[in-house]
């Protein structure tokens, strides 16, 4: 782990500890000190090789780890086979919804990474977007705003300052115009409740759109990995590691939400923004069976709620408030007036 990584871990851990009651701080796992060899270390610029940085991902299988992805042999296409989903013990949330988790071992600071996975059948659920702003027009959405009727909630898209980035349609009305970017994708829910994707340029005036948002970068487009995620010299930072959040769909239409959490310091410090690279997250989404997927705002913004019927609500909170969120209701629940 490099000196900047240790400093980032310590800074975020202090923020997290500040949100924990004093009586429970003693129960937190202790943070290792910065190795002497790294104290005062200076990061020097280096020439980027054209290929991906060497890394691997392994999944826990009982008491052992099985490597299932290596950067030097990264596939350029995923077929929709959900090999990682085979390792998940699924818990029902509502008809057509389930969630579970897997443990990954990766390179560097991702040596212990938990992945929370949610599956949603859009035919048996209602999807809607939600926003929240203060009187000063600062972004203000967090898990505390999730309506009781919603079974799943997750922050949506990316944001610039206090507004969502790119195209936003709320209940049939355009809230923000489309953004432009070679790796942008639009997640669209039409008036019939169907989910569809628009990768690349988006037209502002579209009939039949109930809810929509844009995000970036595109991870998968009809099974293909975005070419910019296969090289280190294509304009995307393929070295940076962070807590990741992504949304995608399988060929049968199943919606998949995946969030990574730092798994080395216990659940209470899971929001520490250490985790996977963008190419690694693309691989995770491919191995979960998706053929279309996009990254959402991760890091300290990432937040996810799952409300099981008759069981306490599971919350994976973020530190930063966001301007936009996706809510998922059972098909019988109302989505308006939230």
Summary of predicted features, one role per range:
Residues 116, 184-186, 217, 245, ...:
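Small-molecule pocket liners
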Residues 7-180, 185-186, 196:
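Zymogen propeptides
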Residues 121-123, 188-194, 222, 249-253, ...:
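Short acidic-glycine loop/turn motifs at beta-strand connectors
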Residues 1-6:
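Short, Lys/Arg-rich N-terminal segment immediately upstream of the first membrane anchor
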Residues 132-138, 201-206, 259-265:
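Short, solvent-exposed aromatic-acidic interface loops
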Residues 157-239:
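Active-site-adjacent helix-turn-beta-strand microarchitecture at beta-sheet edges
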Residues 138-142, 205-210, 266-274:
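A short, polar/proline- and glycine-enriched secondary-structure boundary/capping micro-motif
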Residues 163-181, 233-338:
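Conserved, well-ordered active-site substructure
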